[in-house]
């Protein structure tokens, strides 16, 4: 009877406050416990939250409004590149005039002048473009300049973005790549070193990897069935022979970005040294002849070494009484010394590669 009366009597004010306090403590402990367990189960949760914030920031920068994105699309959107923030233009690329002209005709013109081509299926921009050739010859620069010139949203897709330890998540991320690109079209999905991601399939491939590749190619095929879709998959590789034949079929437009010829090297050197302090007696044609086999990246590094020689000489010839006030111009001899250094470096690298090959 006493117990019944205790339950039936109203709670005092202190008891109510105490009960609310205990419930609050219990709720807070439960919340943080669950949050800790979720974070422990998914260690990438923090990175996903940061990626979402980055994606929202990029979406605002490129002027995309009122577009709802899924969680997976947000993860991909973190790799968006604002075309206005790209500093690469056609004027930054020398010696590839033929490639640039073909790209303008086959890719850029159908996007920028869409109204001229909308009634023809043959004149639509290709759904796959492959840039292949030796390293350091400007493939990535060409892709960025193409996106900027065409006014496309640029998704710089990293293969690691599509890998997830949870079963089925990689396929969802692959689907998000294309659904996001369609929402933001015109857009370019750029995959650098595409051979590392979509290499020839074999029976030794992991099941999840094989399923993700199949999903990616299936969604890629979907672009061809949509007549008005303006999404282009652009890949760059220096090992086209490693690409899956099914991928090659989906990239019918191909551009070979080869090692620069003599005239191309001269044009590249002129571009690199255009805004630098260079002696008027420098003969770029002679430098171009001496740099046979150099890529565009090699030529830039060679010119940097020549400029550093000028800095070193200016600093060494200065003293406390007469400090260095300006750096002397780049001379012909500086460039020739830089060529010798680059050749020794390339020769040593090739020897190391051969040693590793022979050991294997």
Curated annotation (Swiss-Prot):
Topology Mitochondrial intermembrane: residue spans: 1-15
Key words of the record: ATP-binding, Cell membrane, Membrane, Mitochondrion, Mitochondrion outer membrane, Nucleotide-binding, Peroxisome, Postsynaptic cell membrane, Synapse, Translocase, Transmembrane, Transmembrane helix
Leading EC class: translocase
Membrane topology classification: Single-pass membrane protein
Coiled-coil blocks: none
Gene3D superfamilies per the UniProt record, alphabetical: 1.10.8.60, P-loop containing nucleotide triphosphate hydrolases
Cytoplasmic compartment segments: 35-360
Subcellular compartments: Mitochondrion outer membrane; Peroxisome membrane; Postsynaptic cell membrane
GO cellular component, as recorded: mitochondrial outer membrane; peroxisomal membrane; postsynaptic membrane
Thylakoid found in the keyword field: no
Residue intervals passing through the bilayer: 16-34
Family matches, as CDD domains: RecA-like_ATAD1 (cd19520)
Alphabetized GO MF terms: ATP binding; ATP hydrolysis activity; membrane protein dislocase activity
Residues the record lists as binding ATP: 133-140
Family: Belongs to the AAA ATPase family. MSP1 subfamily.
Function: Outer mitochondrial translocase required to remove mislocalized tail-anchored transmembrane proteins on mitochondria. Specifically recognizes and binds tail-anchored transmembrane proteins: acts as a dislocase that mediates the ATP-dependent extraction of mistargeted tail-anchored transmembrane proteins from the mitochondrion outer membrane. Also plays a critical role in regulating the surface expression of AMPA receptors (AMPAR), thereby regulating synaptic plasticity and learning and memory.
Protein name in UniProt: Outer mitochondrial transmembrane helix translocase
Lineage: Eukaryota, Metazoa, Chordata, Craniata, Vertebrata
Gene: atad1
């Amino acid at each position: 009877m006493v117990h019944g009366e205790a339950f039936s009597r109203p709670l005092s004010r202190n008891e109510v406050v105490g009960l609310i306090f205990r419930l609050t403590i219990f709720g807070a402990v439960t919340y943080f416990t669950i949050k800790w367990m979720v974070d422990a189960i998914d260690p990438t949760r923090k990175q996903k939250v940061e990626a979402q914030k980055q994606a929202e920031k990029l979406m605002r920068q490129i002027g995309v409004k009122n577009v709802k994105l899924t969680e997976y699309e947000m993860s991909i959107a973190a790799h968006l590149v604002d075309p206005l923030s790209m500093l690469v233009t056609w004027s930054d690329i020398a010696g590839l005039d033929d490639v640039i002209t073909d790209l303008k005709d086959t890719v850029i013109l159908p996007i920028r002048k869409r109204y001229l081509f909308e009634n023809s299926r043959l004149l639509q921009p290709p759904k796959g473009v492959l840039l292949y050739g030796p390293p350091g010859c400007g493939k990535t620069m060409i892709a960025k300049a193409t996106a900027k010139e065409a006014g496309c949203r640029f998704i710089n897709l990293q293969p690691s973005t599509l890998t997830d330890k949870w079963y089925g998540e990689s396929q969802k991320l692959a689907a998000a790549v294309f659904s996001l690109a369609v929402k933001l079209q015109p857009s370019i999905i750029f995959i650098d070193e595409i051979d590392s991601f979509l290499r020839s399939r074999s029976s030794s491939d992991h099941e999840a990897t094989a399923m993700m590749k199949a999903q990616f190619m299936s969604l890629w095929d979907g672009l061809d069935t949509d007549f008005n879709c303006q999404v282009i998959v652009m890949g760059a590789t220096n090992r086209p022979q490693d690409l899956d034949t099914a991928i090659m079929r989906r990239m019918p437009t191909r551009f070979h970005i080869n090692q620069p010829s003599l005239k191309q090297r001269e044009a590249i050197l002129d571009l690199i040294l255009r805004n630098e302090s260079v002696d008027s007696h420098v003969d770029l044609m002679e430098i171009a002849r001496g740099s046979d086999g150099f890529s565009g990246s090699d030529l830039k590094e060679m010119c940097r070494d020549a400029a550093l020689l000028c800095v070193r000489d200016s600093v060494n010839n200065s003293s406390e009484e007469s400090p260095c006030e300006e750096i002397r111009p780049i001379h012909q001899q500086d460039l020739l010394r830089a060529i010798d250094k680059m050749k020794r470096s390339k020769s040593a690298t090739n020897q190391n590669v051969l040693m590793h090959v022979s050991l294997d």
